[in-house]
């Protein structure tokens, strides 16, 4: 493999045995592609805004004299960029402008004669835009729209599995689900009648809907039944015989023909009898007259002479009726063929319970069911039925629905109309009856072929359509009312309903979620999440076990591991690494094509439906060099089952071993050795890891780390190759390679880095350059590391030296013992940034004022504020300190004489305002790193606001000027080259000022043209700079758009440095989590023979019962990696020759059995080898891909190469006594994470605080500064001990005895430790409640 200069800095040794056939796809494409589809112009109008407009427009007036037509739309430029939107707390969005055409027709003239056309562009609200990382900035916070897994539109056949009826009879049903419109359900009842429900209303006999579709009884019977024809000849009754229909019946008479008895009376008819009848060609037999009694007539029979109806269709025949029919001259009688086995008389029975007889009565019945209480008229009933399933405005199956519908009914074409037809409804009923008759299967609702993904774009389009439909009504009204001559499209469209619908979706939909921004992995996982909840989806309470379970079709589409624990388990899933959605929204996964037992590199994406028809081999099947399967029998999956197939039968093979898992699970090394429950916890806990101060790449990884770090968008990635021309903490400048430049540009790329910004979870986002000056860069190289990334690889935690052993009970119940060295080296120190806001409003009594002049506050408290009353940057503050001084006017109160005197002496100020300053919350301390002041338009800015503005302007100017200088330098370098090649000496040029170069003339015409082009570019650059500067100046100096009634907002950002301490939660990547019990001095920690103490001691009992052996293998492999690093370090210290170093590193990379990765260090220069060695000396990073990882043998070989015992265990000594421990201990390096469950956020102790109004008991919870609840079980405990006084104290003065507690407070202050308990307030509440029931209860004092 060819490595770029940057990649050569540190190469991860890969133990993967299977070659990577398919690169890992861009991990955020599900979000970006979907939204792109929504906003891009689509000429066909299949999806996105275009589809929404086309489905609603043109809007015609009620009279038909005018219509409003849609022409096109365009999205404007957003006012602020993403960062500005976050700072200002506004939505990152673009204005939508739509070109509409109002066409007015002549009234008297023939149809279609146009009188007038007016075209105009109309503003239709703002559409939030997606940032390049797949998020939305809504009101200043980053949000993610989670994709939804919902039931695909189409038709589904299902059964109740015998749960509905007490007899356990299985009742079948069919349900037609449209994309929008009413559902249509058909269901059997226990008596085998077929019923229909429209939109889950009351059920009606299913034949009503057929009558409403204009079918007569005879036509209905004709549709659903085969016929048996009886013929009356010479007073004998003959029956047309279809032998196959007799199977399984018992003959009620001798079946004979041509004098031969085929079946004797009362014998069961078998397949042998049927074959005999068919062989002899018997197609007609004589039957006794009684046989016809009870058969059902298939059509109406009328007496031709009198016109009288003898018997109607669906009537049972009797011998009397037969005689009448014979008299009237009917020689042939058609009856329905039914039996109990596989031709039930369901529709015939249903017709008997059907109260309607013709179309009108059926329509009226449907109208009564849909609109109870309204008087039905013929017109209303017809309209209602038409609009239910046959109107394109109200009903839409969608392309997916039609495709699923036609496939389910086994039709050939998959396209068609979005509304239902007669045939659609009758065929669904036929298939349902077939299933009831035992032909055909019910659908599996949890099959991924029946559930589809609805992503951002589609959901936004639906919301947008909802808004448009609301506007449509208003437009129709206006078109009918207004004076059309003066009316313009602008006057008819009100953008409010549209923007309200869109705003509501992005702001408060259940699927629009506050982005989980703990670390890069949690961001990526959140964007790839798939939820079955949300509007139109399931609810937690109703979702059963089946929906949540892993289904065979999840393979390669949805991760079977990563899902939350708790009530949402199985309802929220994660997309597998290689999965993507197809045009219909179904998930598909890639497979390699297999032809005649040879695996090709051709890759096909298959959806769950298509996959069912193939035999698919596992990714770990063994192949020879030509790609043939080595074994004759290969383990494969087919139709959801796994079994052995011969190699010729195989159609496809998995692409990769990590195909089945999600991104989160694919980062767990040795996942194959972990129990699934623990792997689930491991995958979930990686998302909660807090970015540490110094990121440390995992020694044992899976090779997915780079993909996650780059795709998450937290790193800065080179867009084009070049050379690093300038680098500092906040910007990187790349001089682009000549061959990658666009004509007519300076060829300079500038990357500005994000510095110390707050994330959604209050962690710190900060980018640091990881390239040096003059280094060559290729496209896609990582230039700067973000939070939790190290040299472009994901680094969520730290590599810690761990020992598995008990240590004085400090690791009881998963507790973790940590060495003090970990704290001293700041291994798990994290920075958290908190945003505190102070809002100054306009109150009824006057405006609140932000000022340093606060009543009743000492000098000391104001020492950190400037003259505007705002804390200065860099101040170190603790709980209770004032950050922003603010006073609120308070109402006039009746003053006491003393106060009046004071006011007379000292003036007004003190008492008409109260202190409402912003203070640091209790238990928080940190450093102020930034202050922002937002002032309403028209309100005078205070001194601090002006200072900040000045600073921002200076910074913006400096940035833009530097940018311009860099671009100028690049441009003048090219001008210099042109001039020198044009014959002008370089020395002369150096004496001229640069601006004069452009005035020089060259004899060579080509060169002169080039020079003129460059001069043009220079002018353009200058004017562009001026424009940018003006825009920046405008943005910075303009007032802010604040909520009504708000005058000023001051935001203060506090950075809090948190070291690791007892009570913090830590975890490995295998679900091995625990709480730190003690920080132990280094000298007390166990140490090895070299005197190296361990960092962390873990409990060995945490492994066997949990079955996550992956952590042990990781520990061993980590030790080996570290051992090799130490050997390299020793060689570097000795300053060995580069050749020896190269040889040793090459040996390490070559280790392993038929490993795919080939690293050839002979192609590296000596400097590159030294730089590689420098990066490897802390340990050689290793990748062990999921299900394709390092074997036990390889781990032992690596340990040996690192000069370590192959058992992975070493002798340790007790740090306190220096004695050797009795047996050897497993010691190694494990990657440990610090999770975002920090004791600082949870610890809380109440002194005195607020009380509940009714019960007067202290509130609960940290947010309310509440107390600890002493509940009834605790009361029982004290009662059991007979601790009467303690109990009394708990229930009175420590809780809700109002007088007692104030008195006690006074006593304690006076040094008198007595208490006098009185009546608890809750007892009074109880009395009041009893009185409210009408029982008078009074307390009498003795």
Curated annotation (Swiss-Prot):
Keyword Cell cycle listed: no
Keywords from the named record: DNA-directed RNA polymerase, Nucleotidyltransferase, Transcription, Transferase
Keyword Magnesium: no
GO cellular component terms given for this protein: DNA-directed RNA polymerase complex
Catalytic activity annotation: RNA(n) + a ribonucleoside 5'-triphosphate = RNA(n+1) + diphosphate
SUPFAM superfamilies from the UniProt entry: beta and beta-prime subunits of DNA dependent RNA-polymerase (SSF64484)
Residues passing through the membrane, by range: none
Gene Ontology BP term (one): DNA-templated transcription
Enzyme Commission designation: 2.7.7.6
Pfam families: RNA_pol_Rpb2_1 (PF04563), RNA_pol_Rpb2_2 (PF04561), RNA_pol_Rpb2_3 (PF04565), RNA_pol_Rpb2_45 (PF10385), RNA_pol_Rpb2_6 (PF00562), RNA_pol_Rpb2_7 (PF04560)
Similarity-based family: Belongs to the RNA polymerase beta chain family.
Record text on subunit structure and interactions: The RNAP catalytic core consists of 2 alpha, 1 beta, 1 beta' and 1 omega subunit. When a sigma factor is associated with the core the holoenzyme is formed, which can initiate transcription.
Described function: DNA-dependent RNA polymerase catalyzes the transcription of DNA into RNA using the four ribonucleoside triphosphates as substrates.
Protein name: DNA-directed RNA polymerase subunit beta
Lineage: Bacteria, Pseudomonadati, Pseudomonadota, Gammaproteobacteria, Enterobacterales
Gene that encodes the chain: rpoB
């Amino acid at each position: 493999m060819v490595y770029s200069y940057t990649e050569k800095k540190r190469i991860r040794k890969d133990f993967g045995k299977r070659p990577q056939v398919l690169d890992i796809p861009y991990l955020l494409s599900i979000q970006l592609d979907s939204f792109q589809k929504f906003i891009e112009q689509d000429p066909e109008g299949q999806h996105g805004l275009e589809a929404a407009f086309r489905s609603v427009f043109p809007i015609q007036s009620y009279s038909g004299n005018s219509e409003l037509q849609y022409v096109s739309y365009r999205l404007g430029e957003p006012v602020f960029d993403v960062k500005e939107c976050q700072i200002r707390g506004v939505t990152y969005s673009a204005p939508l402008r739509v070109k509409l055409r109002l066409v007015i027709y002549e009234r008297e003239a023939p149809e279609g004669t146009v009188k007038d056309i007016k075209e105009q562009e109309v503003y239709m609200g703002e559409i939030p835009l997606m940032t390049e990382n797949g998020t939305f900035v809504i009101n200043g916070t980053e949000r993610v729209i989670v994709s939804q897994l919902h039931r695909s539109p189409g038709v589904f056949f299902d059964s109740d599995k015998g749960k509905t009826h007490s007899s356990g009879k299985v009742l079948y049903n069919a349900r037609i689900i449209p994309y929008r419109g009413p559902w249509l359900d058909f269901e059997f009842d226990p008596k085998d009648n077929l019923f229909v429900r429209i939109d889950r209303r009351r059920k009606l006999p299913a034949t009503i809907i057929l009558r409403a579709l204009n079918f007569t009884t005879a036509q209905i019977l004709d549709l659903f039944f085969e016929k048996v024809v009886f013929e009356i000849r010479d007073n004998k009754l003959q029956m047309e015989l279809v032998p196959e229909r007799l199977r399984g019946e018992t003959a009620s008479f001798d079946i004979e023909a041509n004098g031969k008895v085929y079946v004797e009376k009362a014998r069961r008819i078998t397949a042998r009898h049927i074959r005999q009848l068919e062989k002899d060609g018997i197609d007609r037999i004589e039957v006794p007259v009684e046989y016809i009694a009870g058969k059902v007539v298939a059509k109406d029979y009328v007496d031709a002479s009198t016109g009288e109806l003898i018997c109607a269709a669906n009537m049972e025949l009797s011998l009397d009726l037969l005689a009448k029919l014979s008299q009237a001259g009917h020689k042939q009688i058609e009856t329905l063929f039914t039996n109990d086995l596989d031709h039930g008389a369901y529709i015939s029975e249903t017709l008997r319970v059907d109260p309607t007889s013709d179309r009108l009565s059926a329509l009226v019945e449907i109208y009564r069911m849909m609109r109870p209480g309204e008087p039905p008229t013929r017109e209303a009933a017809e309209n209602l039925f038409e609009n239910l399933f046959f109107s394109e405005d109200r009903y839409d199956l969608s392309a997916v629905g039609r495709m699923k519908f036609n496939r389910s009914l086994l039709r050939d074409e998959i396209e068609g109309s979005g509304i239902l037809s007669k045939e659609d409804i009758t065929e669904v009923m036929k298939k349902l009856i077939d299933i009831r008759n035992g032909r055909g299967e019910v659908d599996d609702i949890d099959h991924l072929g029946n559930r589809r993904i609805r992503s951002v774009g589609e959901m936004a389009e639906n919301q947008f359509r909802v808004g448009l439909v609301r506007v449509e009504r208003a437009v129709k009204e206006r078109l009918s009312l207004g004076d059309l001559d003066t009316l313009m499209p602008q006057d008819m469209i009100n953008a409010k309903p549209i923007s309200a619908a869109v705003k509501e979706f992005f702001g408060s939909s259940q699927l629009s979620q506050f982005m989980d921004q703990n670390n890069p992995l949690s961001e990526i996982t959140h964007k790839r999440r798939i939820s079955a909840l949300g509007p139109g989806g399931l609810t937690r309470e109703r979702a059963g076990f089946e929906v949540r379970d892993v289904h065979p079709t999840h393979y390669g589409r949805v991760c079977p591991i990563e899902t939350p624990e708790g009530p949402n388990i199985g309802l929220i899933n994660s997309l597998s690494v290689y999965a993507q959605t197809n045009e219909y929204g179904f998930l598909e996964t890639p497979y390699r094509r297999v032809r005649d037992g040879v695996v090709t590199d051709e890759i096909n994406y298959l959806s769950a439906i298509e996959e069912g028809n193939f035999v698919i081999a596992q990714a770990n099947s063994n192949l020879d060099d030509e790609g043939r399967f080595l074994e004759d029998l290969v383990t494969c999956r087919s139709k959801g089952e796994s079994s052995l197939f011969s190699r010729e039968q195989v159609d496809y093979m998995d692409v990769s071993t990590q195909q089945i898992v999600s991104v989160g699970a694919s980062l767990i090394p040795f996942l194959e050795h972990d129990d699934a429950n623990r792997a689930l916890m491991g995958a979930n806990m990686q998302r909660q890891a807090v970015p540490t101060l110094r990121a440390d790449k995992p020694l044992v990884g899976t090779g997915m780390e780079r993909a996650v770090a780059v795709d998450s968008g937290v790193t800065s990635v080179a867009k084009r190759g070049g050379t690093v021309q300038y680098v500092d903490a906040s910007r990187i400048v790349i001089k682009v390679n000549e061959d990658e430049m666009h004509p007519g540009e300076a060829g300079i790329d500038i990357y500005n880095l994000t510095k110390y910004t707050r994330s959604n979870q209050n962690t710190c986002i900060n980018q640091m350059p990881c390239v040096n000056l003059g280094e060559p860069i290729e496209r896609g190289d990582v230039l700067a590391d973000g939070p939790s990334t190290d040299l472009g690889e994901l680094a969520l935690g730290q590599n810690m030296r761990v020992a598995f052993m008990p240590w004085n009970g400090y690791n009881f119940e998963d507790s973790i013992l940590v060495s003090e060295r970990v704290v001293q080296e700041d291994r798990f120190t994290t920075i958290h940034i908190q945003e505190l806001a102070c809002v100054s409003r306009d109150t009824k009594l006057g405006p609140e004022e932000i000022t340093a002049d606060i009543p009743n506050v000492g000098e000391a408290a104001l020492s950190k504020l400037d003259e505007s009353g705002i804390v200065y940057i860099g101040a170190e503050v603790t709980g209770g300190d004032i950050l922003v001084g603010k006073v609120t006017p308070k109402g006039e109160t009746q003053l006491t004489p003393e106060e009046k005197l004071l006011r007379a002496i000292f003036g007004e100020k003190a008492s008409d305002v109260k202190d409402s300053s912003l203070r640091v919350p209790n238990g928080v301390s940190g450093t102020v790193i930034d202050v922002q002041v937002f002032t309403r338009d028209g309100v005078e800015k205070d001194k601090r606001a002006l200072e900040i503005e000045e600073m921002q302007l200076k910074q913006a100017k400096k940035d833009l000027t530097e940018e311009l200088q860099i671009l100028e330098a690049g441009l003048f370098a090219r001008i210099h080259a042109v001039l020198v090649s044009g014959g002008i000496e370089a020395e002369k040029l150096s004496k001229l000022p640069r601006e004069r170069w452009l005035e020089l003339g060259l004899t060579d015409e080509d060169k002169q043209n080039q020079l003129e082009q460059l001069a043009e570019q220079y002018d353009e650059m200058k004017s562009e700079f001026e424009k940018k500067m003006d825009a920046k100046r405008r943005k910075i100096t303009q007032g802010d758009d604040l909520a009504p009634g708000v005058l000023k907002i001051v935001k203060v950002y506090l950075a809090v440095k948190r070291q690791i301490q007892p009570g913090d939660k830590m975890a490995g990547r295998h679900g091995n989590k625990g709480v730190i019990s003690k920080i132990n001095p280094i000298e007390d920690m166990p140490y090895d023979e070299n005197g190296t103490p361990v960092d962390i001691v873990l409990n060995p009992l945490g492994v066997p019962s949990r079955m996550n052996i992956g952590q042990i293998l990781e520990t061993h492999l980590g030790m080996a990696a570290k051992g090799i690093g130490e050997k390299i370090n020793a060689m570097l210290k000795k300053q060995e020759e580069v050749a020896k170093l190269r040889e040793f590193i090459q040996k390490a990379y070559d280790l392993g059995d038929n490993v795919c990765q080939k690293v050839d260090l002979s192609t590296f220069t000596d400097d590159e080898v030294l730089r590689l060695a420098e990066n490897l000396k802390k340990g050689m990073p290793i990748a062990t891909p999921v299900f394709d990882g390092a074997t036990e043998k390889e781990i032992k070989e690596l340990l040996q190469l690192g000069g370590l015992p192959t058992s992975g265990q070493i002798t340790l000594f007790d740090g306190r006594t220096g004695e050797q421990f009795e047996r050897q201990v497993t010691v190694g390096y494990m990657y440990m994470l610090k999770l975002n469950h920090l004791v600082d956020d949870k610890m809380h102790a109440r002194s005195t605080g607020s009380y509940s109004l009714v019960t007067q008991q202290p509130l609960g919870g940290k947010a309310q500064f509440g107390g600890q609840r002493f509940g009834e079980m605790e009361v029982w405990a004290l009662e059991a001990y007979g601790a009467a006084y303690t109990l009394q104290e708990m229930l009175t003065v420590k809780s809700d005895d109002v007088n007692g507690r104030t008195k006690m407070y006074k006593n304690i202050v006076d040094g008198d430790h007595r208490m006098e308990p009185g009546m608890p307030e809750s007892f009074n509440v109880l009395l009041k409640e009893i009185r409210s029931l009408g029982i008078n209860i009074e307390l009498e004092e003795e």
